[in-house]
Regions:
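Binuclear metal-dependent hydrolase catalytic cores
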Residues: 1-166
């Protein structure tokens, strides 16, 4: 089983600011030495020794969490902007069964759905689940003019199910 947070930000997706990027660059420059630049191997060793806060970013995409059960089946919790990158990873999979759980219909939990590449792959089977009734109607409205050029009925194998959690 594998899991990954593809988005953790609430409300609005936000890219890395210029100030934060400059802070990371300054940190790298303060740590580097001439010997770290001598060869490909020394550069790779230096880069791999840098702390995660310098070499990665967190918090840019809105809510999306993946739990991979197998190579052919994945569970996704919420579909914020992080689902777009996840979809790019999943698009190469054949005959993939995808389960998407939508906790609620706030924009930051659904705004990545129209850009989820497996929607446009006839080999993908996508199941939606929500504790709220009306998910299919709500998503059909989101994937309709003037909000999006491709109607949900033009997407491939989609199933919808309301969950009674009480």
């Amino acid at each position: 089983m594998r899991y990954k947070f593809w988005g953790v930000r609430g409300s609005v997706p936000t890219s890395l600011s210029s100030d934060k990027l400059m802070s990371k660059i300054h940190s790298i420059l303060q740590q580097i030495s001439v010997s770290d630049l001598e060869s490909v191997t020394s550069r790779e060793k230096f880069i791999s020794s840098l702390p995660k806060w310098v070499t990665s970013t967190v918090g840019g995409n809105t809510t999306c969490f993946e739990v991979g059960i197998s190579e052919k089946e994945v569970f996704i919790f919420d579909a914020g902007t992080g689902i777009r990158e996840l979809g790019k990873k999943l698009i190469s999979e054949k005959n993939l069964k995808i389960h998407i759980f939508i906790s609620h219909f706030h924009w930051d939990h659904i705004q990545g759905l129209p850009f989820f590449d497996p929607f446009f792959n006839p080999k993908s089977e996508i199941h939606f689940y929500s504790p709220k009734d009306g998910l299919k109607d709500f998503l059909e409205q989101q994937a309709d003019s003037p909000y999006f050029p491709v109607k949900m009925k033009n997407m491939y194998i989609l199933y919808f199910r309301s969950l009674n959690l009480l």
